[in-house]
Amino acid sequence: NDDMVWQLKNKPAMEHASNLGAIIADAIAKPLGIPAFIYDGVTVDEMMPILKITGLKELSRKGIGHNLNTRAAAMKYAREHGKEYKDCKLIVVHLGGGISITLQYGGKVADIINDEDGPFAPERAGGLPSQDLIKYFGQSGMTAKEMLKKMKSRGGLVAHLGVNDSREVEKMIENGDEHAKLIYDAMALNVAR
Protein backbone atom coordinates (compact mmCIF):
# COMPACT_ATOMS: atom_id res chain seq x y z
CA ASN A 1 0.00 0.00 0.00
CA ASP A 2 1.00 3.65 -0.12
CA ASP A 3 2.30 3.57 3.46
CA MET A 4 4.67 0.71 2.66
CA VAL A 5 5.95 2.42 -0.49
CA TRP A 6 6.49 5.67 1.43
CA GLN A 7 8.34 3.83 4.20
CA LEU A 8 10.59 2.02 1.73
CA LYS A 9 11.40 5.23 -0.13
CA ASN A 10 11.89 7.49 2.88
CA LYS A 11 12.70 5.49 6.01
CA PRO A 12 13.67 1.92 5.13
CA ALA A 13 14.58 -0.41 7.98
CA MET A 14 17.82 -1.04 6.07
CA GLU A 15 19.42 -0.09 2.78
CA HIS A 16 19.02 -3.07 0.46
CA ALA A 17 18.12 -3.75 -3.18
CA SER A 18 15.13 -5.81 -2.03
CA ASN A 19 13.45 -2.57 -0.91
CA LEU A 20 12.71 -1.94 -4.58
CA GLY A 21 10.40 -4.99 -4.87
CA ALA A 22 7.29 -3.40 -3.37
CA ILE A 23 7.99 -0.06 -5.08
CA ILE A 24 8.27 -1.72 -8.51
CA ALA A 25 5.22 -3.93 -7.88
CA ASP A 26 3.19 -0.86 -6.91
CA ALA A 27 4.35 1.08 -10.00
CA ILE A 28 3.26 -1.79 -12.26
CA ALA A 29 -0.01 -2.60 -10.50
CA LYS A 30 -1.47 0.89 -9.95
CA PRO A 31 -1.82 1.88 -13.63
CA LEU A 32 -3.38 -1.52 -14.35
CA GLY A 33 -5.79 -1.27 -11.43
CA ILE A 34 -4.69 -4.59 -9.97
CA PRO A 35 -3.40 -5.46 -6.50
CA ALA A 36 0.31 -5.90 -5.85
CA PHE A 37 1.75 -8.25 -3.27
CA ILE A 38 5.14 -9.01 -1.82
CA TYR A 39 5.96 -12.27 -0.11
CA ASP A 40 8.38 -12.95 2.71
CA GLY A 41 9.83 -9.46 2.97
CA VAL A 42 13.50 -9.26 3.85
CA THR A 43 12.80 -7.07 6.88
CA VAL A 44 10.12 -9.24 8.47
CA ASP A 45 11.16 -9.36 12.11
CA GLU A 46 9.93 -12.49 13.90
CA MET A 47 12.68 -12.52 16.50
CA MET A 48 11.64 -13.42 20.04
CA PRO A 49 11.37 -10.14 22.03
CA ILE A 50 13.66 -11.39 24.81
CA LEU A 51 16.44 -11.92 22.25
CA LYS A 52 16.31 -8.26 21.17
CA ILE A 53 17.48 -6.96 24.54
CA THR A 54 21.07 -5.66 24.72
CA GLY A 55 23.23 -4.18 27.46
CA LEU A 56 22.14 -0.65 26.51
CA LYS A 57 18.43 0.10 26.80
CA GLU A 58 18.69 2.55 23.88
CA LEU A 59 19.84 -0.18 21.49
CA SER A 60 18.18 -3.44 20.53
CA ARG A 61 19.02 -6.33 18.25
CA LYS A 62 17.01 -6.55 15.05
CA GLY A 63 15.65 -9.64 13.34
CA ILE A 64 16.88 -8.45 9.97
CA GLY A 65 19.20 -10.51 7.83
CA HIS A 66 19.07 -13.01 5.02
CA ASN A 67 15.60 -14.20 6.04
CA LEU A 68 14.42 -14.93 2.50
CA ASN A 69 17.25 -17.31 1.74
CA THR A 70 17.38 -19.04 5.11
CA ARG A 71 13.61 -19.50 5.28
CA ALA A 72 13.55 -20.94 1.74
CA ALA A 73 16.37 -23.34 2.65
CA ALA A 74 14.54 -24.41 5.82
CA MET A 75 11.30 -24.97 3.91
CA LYS A 76 13.16 -27.00 1.29
CA TYR A 77 14.78 -29.12 4.00
CA ALA A 78 11.39 -29.75 5.64
CA ARG A 79 9.80 -30.69 2.31
CA GLU A 80 12.67 -33.04 1.37
CA HIS A 81 12.39 -34.77 4.76
CA GLY A 82 8.59 -35.10 4.72
CA LYS A 83 8.07 -32.61 7.55
CA GLU A 84 6.04 -29.46 8.04
CA TYR A 85 8.26 -26.39 8.25
CA LYS A 86 6.40 -25.24 11.38
CA ASP A 87 7.34 -28.51 13.12
CA CYS A 88 11.09 -28.21 12.45
CA LYS A 89 13.78 -26.76 14.71
CA LEU A 90 16.69 -25.75 12.48
CA ILE A 91 19.85 -23.70 12.43
CA VAL A 92 20.28 -22.31 8.93
CA VAL A 93 23.26 -20.28 7.71
CA HIS A 94 23.36 -17.91 4.73
CA LEU A 95 26.86 -17.53 3.28
CA GLY A 96 27.12 -14.66 0.80
CA GLY A 97 28.50 -11.12 0.74
CA GLY A 98 27.11 -11.06 4.27
CA ILE A 99 26.59 -14.00 6.61
CA SER A 100 23.49 -14.63 8.73
CA ILE A 101 22.89 -17.51 11.13
CA THR A 102 19.25 -18.20 11.99
CA LEU A 103 17.37 -20.30 14.49
CA GLN A 104 14.06 -21.36 12.97
CA TYR A 105 11.24 -23.06 14.79
CA GLY A 106 7.48 -22.84 14.96
CA GLY A 107 7.47 -21.64 11.35
CA LYS A 108 9.40 -18.49 12.23
CA VAL A 109 12.91 -17.07 12.19
CA ALA A 110 13.04 -16.95 16.00
CA ASP A 111 16.61 -15.65 16.28
CA ILE A 112 19.22 -14.32 13.92
CA ILE A 113 22.87 -13.44 14.18
CA ASN A 114 23.22 -11.09 11.24
CA ASP A 115 26.12 -9.43 9.51
CA GLU A 116 26.17 -6.63 12.09
CA ASP A 117 26.69 -8.77 15.17
CA GLY A 118 28.02 -12.04 13.84
CA PRO A 119 30.97 -13.33 11.84
CA PHE A 120 32.77 -11.21 9.30
CA ALA A 121 31.97 -12.09 5.71
CA PRO A 122 33.34 -11.49 2.22
CA GLU A 123 32.18 -7.84 2.34
CA ARG A 124 30.94 -7.22 5.89
CA ALA A 125 32.98 -6.41 8.98
CA GLY A 126 30.66 -8.39 11.24
CA GLY A 127 30.57 -7.91 15.00
CA LEU A 128 33.45 -5.76 16.23
CA PRO A 129 34.83 -4.95 19.69
CA SER A 130 32.61 -1.99 20.64
CA GLN A 131 35.17 0.10 22.54
CA ASP A 132 37.79 -0.29 19.83
CA LEU A 133 35.20 0.52 17.16
CA ILE A 134 34.18 3.73 18.94
CA LYS A 135 37.83 4.80 19.30
CA TYR A 136 38.59 3.93 15.66
CA PHE A 137 35.57 5.87 14.42
CA GLY A 138 36.53 8.89 16.52
CA GLN A 139 40.08 8.88 15.16
CA SER A 140 39.24 7.97 11.55
CA GLY A 141 37.79 11.30 10.42
CA MET A 142 35.02 9.40 8.64
CA THR A 143 31.38 10.42 8.76
CA ALA A 144 28.89 7.92 10.16
CA LYS A 145 27.70 7.21 6.61
CA GLU A 146 31.28 6.52 5.44
CA MET A 147 31.93 4.26 8.41
CA LEU A 148 28.74 2.27 7.77
CA LYS A 149 29.73 1.85 4.12
CA LYS A 150 33.15 0.59 5.17
CA MET A 151 31.57 -1.92 7.56
CA LYS A 152 28.92 -3.09 5.05
CA SER A 153 30.86 -3.26 1.79
CA ARG A 154 34.59 -2.88 2.50
CA GLY A 155 34.97 -5.14 5.52
CA GLY A 156 35.73 -8.84 5.87
CA LEU A 157 37.66 -10.48 3.05
CA VAL A 158 37.70 -7.18 1.14
CA ALA A 159 39.43 -5.42 4.06
CA HIS A 160 41.97 -8.19 4.61
CA LEU A 161 42.59 -9.53 1.10
CA GLY A 162 41.12 -7.00 -1.34
CA VAL A 163 38.61 -9.47 -2.84
CA ASN A 164 35.02 -10.46 -2.09
CA ASP A 165 34.95 -13.73 -4.02
CA SER A 166 35.72 -16.85 -1.99
CA ARG A 167 36.86 -18.64 -5.14
CA GLU A 168 39.64 -16.08 -5.53
CA VAL A 169 40.63 -16.59 -1.89
CA GLU A 170 40.75 -20.35 -2.43
CA LYS A 171 43.06 -19.81 -5.44
CA MET A 172 45.29 -17.60 -3.29
CA ILE A 173 45.48 -20.39 -0.72
CA GLU A 174 46.22 -23.01 -3.40
CA ASN A 175 49.10 -20.79 -4.52
CA GLY A 176 50.58 -20.87 -1.02
CA ASP A 177 49.29 -17.57 0.42
CA GLU A 178 49.43 -18.24 4.19
CA HIS A 179 47.81 -14.90 5.08
CA ALA A 180 44.83 -15.70 2.85
CA LYS A 181 44.54 -19.10 4.56
CA LEU A 182 44.62 -17.48 8.00
CA ILE A 183 41.87 -14.98 7.11
CA TYR A 184 39.69 -17.59 5.39
CA ASP A 185 40.07 -19.97 8.34
CA ALA A 186 39.21 -17.11 10.72
CA MET A 187 36.01 -16.40 8.78
CA ALA A 188 35.04 -20.09 8.83
CA LEU A 189 35.77 -20.37 12.54
CA ASN A 190 33.65 -17.29 13.25
CA VAL A 191 30.72 -18.89 11.41
CA ALA A 192 31.17 -22.20 13.23
CA ARG A 193 31.27 -20.76 16.71
Features from the language model and the residues they span:
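Glycine-rich phosphate-binding loop and adjoining helix at the ATP-binding site
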Residues: 2-75
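Glycine-rich phosphate-binding loop plus the immediately following alpha-helix
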Residues: 23-26, 38, 58-87, 97, ...
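Short, acidic Gly/Pro/Ser/Thr-rich loop/turn segments
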Residues: 44-46, 98-100, 119
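Short, well-ordered secondary-structure micro-motifs
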Residues: 49, 103, 159-162
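Adenine-nucleotide phosphate-binding core of ATP-dependent small-molecule kinases
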Residues: 149-193
